[in-house]
């Protein structure tokens, strides 16, 4: 998996996994030594290019002694130029910072923040409880709050009092998981919202913040028990696996819209965004 984003000045940021110990890194970068195994992603890398893509501004490894990889679309840049990445690691020595959300080395999902110059790890944490979690979606708002979405097999996530749903819906099959949504404060990196949401489904999910205070969350649940709203396109699933699209108010984290849609077999939604205040475009 990999991710790419562009900041307001046109600089290009790329994150991914590498098995190459000679992957190009720059002097003074956070980590210039390859740490991982040469399989399943090796180490994560974060690289910043100039706007024309002709020069490396900085490039660094991030990882432990086993292996890790970045989540799809798992890189964003906040208003201060800090670089946020999410992914999965199997390394017990993956670099963490003080005041982390979770330091349990059984956890495989991670969330990390690099300084604008790529030289300092400002924040890094595992995310989860007692079983494997996967972070599949990452977005930030205009106040630099971080939103993540993903999937879990565990009932032990630290849900908040204002959660939409506080209990997991146990998957009926070993390859299915329950979706979760979390909001993390920009300054103290504490969880301000965490909820189970979309019933059991595959782990892929997409999340996108847009003005004014709208949070789109999409994925592919099984239809049973999905919390559709009265204005949904479809309130019942039609196939083995359906798409869902939902909209939250990002300030209150209240659900404003949720719908299922799809055909008679398996369907997956991979991206979505508003093109005006009332219209969402989706792709999958």
Task: Give the residues covered by each predicted segment.
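A sequence-level/structural motif corresponding to short, flexible coil/turn segments enriched
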Residues: 1-284
